[in-house]
Amino acid sequence: MAHQKEQRTFALIKPDGVQRSLIGEIISRFERTGLKFVAFKFLVPTREQCFAHYAKDDAWCVKVGERTITGKKEKGLPVEKSALEYGRDILEGNVRFLTSGPVLAMCLEGNQAVGIVKKLVGGTEPLTSDVGTIRADLTIDSYEIANADDRCVRNLIHCSDEPKEAERELKIWFKDGELISYHHINEVTLYDVDLGHILGK
């Protein structure tokens, strides 16, 4: 079993993050925490890759579809489809957006990497995400505007929610051997039990 400081997580800068030239800003925020990158991949995803990534079944589609129906009723808008159909439309919209242009897939490693990256990224909706997070600081989209325009919310980046999800997603986006194991000088400062030999004491 790997040491906690070797935990790995997955993050993906979406097409809107790439098009707004925010790759450097986002990467620097991750690096400043002390996490290290062990893989990058710049690509235009396939539909198959995206459906595997989202891994949503009909139960999920019904659940989000029901929320869509509730929202339409609250606004006095007509309900023209079933919850399942609305949910499938949402999933299709997510896939269509993710395949619309280049993305940057990343693997980061370090102590509590999953939780650290999730904290930096912020909540799914930029409008309500905590101040200081990537989504709150770098974009102003909201569910309300996205729903009105019949599109997915543009929130710049995806990250894994938990370690098992990170393991699953990394296998979708990276092949065996593409995750690089190496020593980074920062690890000595972050994790070494005794800094005396570094500080000359």
Label every model-predicted segment:
Residues 1-201:
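Non-catalytic terminal and connector segments of soluble metabolic enzymes
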